């Protein structure tokens, strides 16, 4: 097993996740199976209860584990579907150590950070790597070198480095190379970051410099001199127009060749699908504007997978997607409004704040023939809007938003009743969905059975299905033997489509999600017709 560990210095938010995912992509293109592990030093067990304003999107894995958004980058770049074991948190490690202590596994020892916590970290990494049957294990340590939360993990990595063969271990350190007022690239932050890393017993094999422009030869030479690495191990990672260009930047920098020599590997093949995908993406000449109507629009990472899935759909449809961010609360405070866009998307979410604004956006899309895609909460709100304005249940609602609504067209899942804990208790992960033949959904997917990821507590109330369908809204897919509605569509609308599941979590740049492809194609058609 070869281990590539990615750490970060100077500041958070430099793009360690994209760096790690891009390195993984390089090895995938050379014919290797790569498996990622993301270490998050926070004490939370998982990301499921975290506020999107603080943490961005909660990404859902196939086994239902709620994780950091970087796991989404890994799945999209590397092409592997992973499980909750591929996300290590301080909470998980401490929980495991405490459980062992309670069972007496430590035989009366004083349980300490070293060796018990560090041994648990190493054991977890090696177990996941072995069970994956991969050839390369990519480990990203979240946070910044020097953070107190990350110290046990860095110590565990130091020990692993000493325990593994030199040719089986590579450490990549991502740092910031800022520009001063005169435009000079400054290396001092990188020097200090590497110094701090070395004080912990770790020496980087590769230094990736994040900068607004390509690192100059003189900058690379200076970093190499003061940080004690070869010049060829100083890699430029300048700002790119799109994150999918980063693997190509690394290939230009010959990072793949350097790591192959360090790990004593040879390329098995030379795949071009990623490079070809980026070329297609950069040559799209038609455009369509799509509004994302949500309440977390000030934190764009809260809808990261949706942004990426729209991009994937655009590549397939031959169309560049321009996103227009609309705060749903703003739509609640106006008598009338116009959304000058080619498509409207209402994403997942929770709670009453902004919900009525989303319902108004859905009504606008339905009445004006604007292509619409609803996801999870957006699916539920689409059902509510239809029940109110077409079926005639003017006070229809979800019991999440109004416990006393006379028409609870959306209600709590039966198995959710009586659950008090929030973390990891929703209907989560991959679930098989059955699609009815002859529907828009069947045309998009081309199959009667699909597997999609879920994250919800509420569902369409079965008592209202027949009444709603009698007025024209078709529930075209279901799960759990027909008990749960999964897709709603309007056959006579240019494109009105909503899913209870989250199709964005399984969308890939070279294998886009069918609902997003259909949605973007409909938006492009709408734009063409508007221009005539």
Swiss-Prot record:
Pathway: Pyrimidine metabolism; CTP biosynthesis via de novo pathway; CTP from UDP: step 2/2. Its EC number is 6.3.4.2. The active site is at residues 376, 502, 504. CTP binds at residues 12, 147-149, 186-191, 222. L-glutamine binds at residues 349, 377-380, 400, 457. Residues 1-265 are annotated as: Amidoligase domain. It holds the Pfam family GATase. Allosterically activated by GTP, when glutamine is the substrate; GTP has no effect on the reaction when ammonia is the substrate. The allosteric effector GTP functions by stabilizing the protein conformation that binds the tetrahedral intermediate(s) formed during glutamine hydrolysis. Inhibited by the product CTP, via allosteric rather than competitive inhibition. One of its GO terms (biological process) is 'de novo' CTP biosynthetic process. InterPro entries: Class_I_gatase-like (IPR029062), CTP_synthase (IPR004468), CTP_synthase_N (IPR017456), GATASE (IPR017926), GATase1_CTP_Synthase (IPR033828), P-loop_NTPase (IPR027417). Mg(2+) binds at residues 70, 140. CDD domains: CTPS_N (cd03113), GATase1_CTP_Synthase (cd01746). UTP binds at residues 12, 186-191, 222. It catalyses: UTP + L-glutamine + ATP + H2O = CTP + L-glutamate + ADP + phosphate + 2 H(+); L-glutamine + H2O = L-glutamate + NH4(+); UTP + NH4(+) + ATP = CTP + ADP + phosphate + 2 H(+). Belongs to the CTP synthase family. Homotetramer. Catalyzes the ATP-dependent amination of UTP to CTP with either L-glutamine or ammonia as the source of nitrogen. Regulates intracellular CTP levels through interactions with the four ribonucleotide triphosphates. This is CTP synthase. It comes from Archaeoglobus fulgidus (strain ATCC 49558 / DSM 4304 / JCM 9628 / NBRC 100126 / VC-16).
């Amino acid at each position: 097993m070869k281990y590539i560990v990615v750490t970060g210095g100077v500041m958070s938010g430099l793009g360690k996740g994209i760096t790690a995912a891009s390195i993984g992509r390089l090895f995938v293109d050379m014919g290797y199976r790569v498996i990622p592990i993301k270490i998050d030093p926070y004490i939370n067990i998982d990301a499921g209860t975290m506020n999107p304003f603080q943490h961005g999107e909660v990404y859902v894995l196939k086994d239902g584990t709620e994780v950091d958004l970087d796991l989404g980058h890994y799945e999209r770049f590397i092409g592997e579907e992973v499980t909750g074991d591929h996300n290590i948190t301080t909470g998980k490690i401490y929980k495991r150590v405490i459980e062992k202590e309670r069972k007496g596994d430590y035989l009366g020892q004083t349980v300490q950070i070293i060796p018990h916590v560090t041994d648990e970290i190493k054991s977890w990494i090696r177990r996941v790597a072995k069970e994956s049957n991969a050839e390369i294990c990519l480990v990203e340590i979240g946070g910044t070198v020097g953070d107190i939360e990350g110290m046990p993990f860095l110590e565990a990595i130091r020990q692993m480095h000493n325990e593994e063969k030199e040719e089986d271990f590579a450490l990549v350190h991502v740092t910031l190379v800022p520009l001063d007022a005169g435009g000079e690239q400054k290396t001092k932050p990188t020097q200090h970051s590497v110094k701090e890393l070395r004080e912990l017993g770790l020496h980087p094999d590769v230094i990736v410099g994040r900068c607004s422009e390509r690192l100059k030869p003189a900058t690379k030479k200076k970093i190499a001199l003061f940080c004690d690495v070869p010049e060829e191990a100083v890699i430029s990672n300048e700002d790119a127009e799109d994150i999918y260009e980063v693997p190509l930047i690394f290939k230009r920098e010959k990072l793949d060749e350097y790591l192959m020599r360090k790990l004593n590997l040879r390329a098995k093949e030379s795949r071009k699908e990623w490079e070809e995908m980026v070329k297609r993406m950069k040559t799209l000449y038609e455009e369509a504007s799509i509004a994302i109507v949500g309440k977390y629009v000030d934190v764009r990472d809260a809808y990261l997978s949706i942004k990426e899935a729209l991009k994937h759909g655009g590549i397939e449809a031959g169309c560049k997607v321009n996103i227009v961010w609309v705060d749903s609360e703003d739509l609640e405070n106006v008598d009338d409004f116009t959304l000058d866009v080619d498509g409207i998307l209402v994403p997942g979410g929770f709670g009453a704040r902004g919900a009525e604004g989303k319902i108004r956006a859905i009504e606008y899309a339905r009445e004006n023939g604007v292509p619409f895609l609803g996801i999870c909460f957006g699916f539920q709100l689409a059902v509510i809007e239809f029940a109110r304005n077409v079926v005639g249940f003017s006070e229809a609602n979800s019991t999440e938003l109004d416990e006393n609504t006379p028409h609870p067209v959306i209600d709590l899942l039966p198995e959710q009743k009586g659950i008090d804990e929030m973390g990891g208790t929703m209907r989560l992960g991959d679930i098989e969905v059955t699609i009815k033949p002859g529907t828009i959904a069947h045309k998009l997917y081309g199959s009667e059975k699909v597997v999609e990821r879920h994250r919800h507590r509420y569902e369409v109330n079965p008592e209202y299905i027949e009444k709603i369908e009698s007025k024209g809204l078709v529930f075209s897919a279901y799960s759990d033997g027909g008990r749960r509605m999964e897709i709603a569509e309007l056959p006579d609308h240019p494109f009105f489509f909503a899913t209870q599941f989250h199709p964005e979590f399984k969308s890939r740049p070279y294998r886009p999600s069918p609902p997003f492809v259909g949605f973007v194609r409909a938006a492009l058609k709408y734009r063409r017709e508007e221009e005539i």
